[in-house]
């Protein structure tokens, strides 16, 4: 999906600007035991801005993606996970954990995709690490899908606090539809069965939710920071899923070319007779 990187880069730039325009509220999210809250708000904003530009123009994009993935992992470890542990019965707290992991997983999948295009085989560590983005987004999809059936009145995609406005047609039906796709895609991703197809269809489904639900909300309240955040938050989720789909596509293509090269080498005149006899 060629739009995955763009759908990921644009929200990064939007959220970066909020670190400079809404610094006080952003700094308040930093844990108390970390000093210099304002500094970290500006630093993360600058990092997101540079990363968004890097991804958009594809200059040092994989390095930027790796740094973004590490940043979201830090968010999970120092903010989201402690908050979820402190409030274990809050579904929104765990939604935040899975959301940040999904964002980081999409960036991590893009950063790892470079290994699938290299002429030399990837290291065993890289092969094992490539499983993590698929599992993270798969588990998040399963959890989010279940929430869509328990609370269909809330906005689809990432099931947070906002309730879908009643004036949007087909909101409940769409919520159930997105929930079904999330669960089915989550099963495929976790089981690694038709994972690329599942990720692609899931990304397109989340994009449908962005256009059907979040865009009208943003148009109806263009000055609302909440509407802006929900729109680009879900678009970022869509981008992360499509980046995963793209990485899985490259992985499949690399495996195909590797097998084809092995067959070609076996049939080459310079290959030993024993090698040619093993080829079906």
What do these predicted ranges mean?
Residues 1-21, 39-50, 56-153, 169-184, ...:
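Extended, low-polarity transmembrane helix blocks
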Residues 22-34, 155-168:
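Short juxtamembrane and helix-loop transition motifs at transmembrane-helix boundaries
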């Amino acid at each position: 999906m060629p739009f995955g990187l763009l759908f990921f880069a644009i929200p990064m730039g939007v959220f970066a600007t909020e670190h400079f325009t809404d610094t006080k509220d952003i700094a308040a999210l930093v844990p108390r035991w970390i000093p210099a809250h304002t500094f970290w708000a500006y630093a993360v904003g600058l990092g997101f801005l540079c990363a968004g530009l890097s991804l958009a123009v594809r200059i040092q994009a994989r390095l930027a993606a790796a740094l973004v993935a590490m940043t979201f992992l830090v968010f999970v470890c120092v903010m989201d996970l402690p908050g979820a542990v402190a409030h274990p019965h809050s579904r929104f707290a765990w939604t935040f954990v899975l959301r940040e992991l999904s964002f980081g997983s999409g960036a991590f999948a893009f950063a790892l995709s470079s290994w699938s295009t290299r002429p030399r085989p990837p290291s065993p560590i890289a092969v094992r690490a490539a499983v993590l983005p698929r599992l993270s987004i798969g588990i998040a999809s399963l959890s989010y899908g279940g929430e869509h059936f328990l609370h269909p009145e809330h906005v689809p995609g990432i099931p947070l606090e906002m309730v879908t406005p009643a004036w949007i047609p087909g909101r409940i039906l769409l919520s159930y539809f997105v929930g079904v796709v999330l669960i089915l895609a989550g099963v495929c991703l976790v089981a690694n069965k038709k994972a690329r197809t599942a990720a692609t269809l899931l990304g397109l489904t989340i994009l449908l939710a962005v256009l059907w639900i979040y865009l009208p909300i943003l148009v109806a309240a263009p000055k609302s920071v909440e509407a802006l955040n929900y729109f680009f938050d879900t678009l970022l989720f869509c981008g992360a899923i499509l980046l995963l789909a793209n990485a899985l596509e490259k992985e499949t293509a690399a495996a195909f070319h590797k097998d084809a090269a092995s067959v070609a080498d076996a049939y080459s005149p310079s290959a030993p007779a024993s090698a040619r006899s093993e080829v079906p």
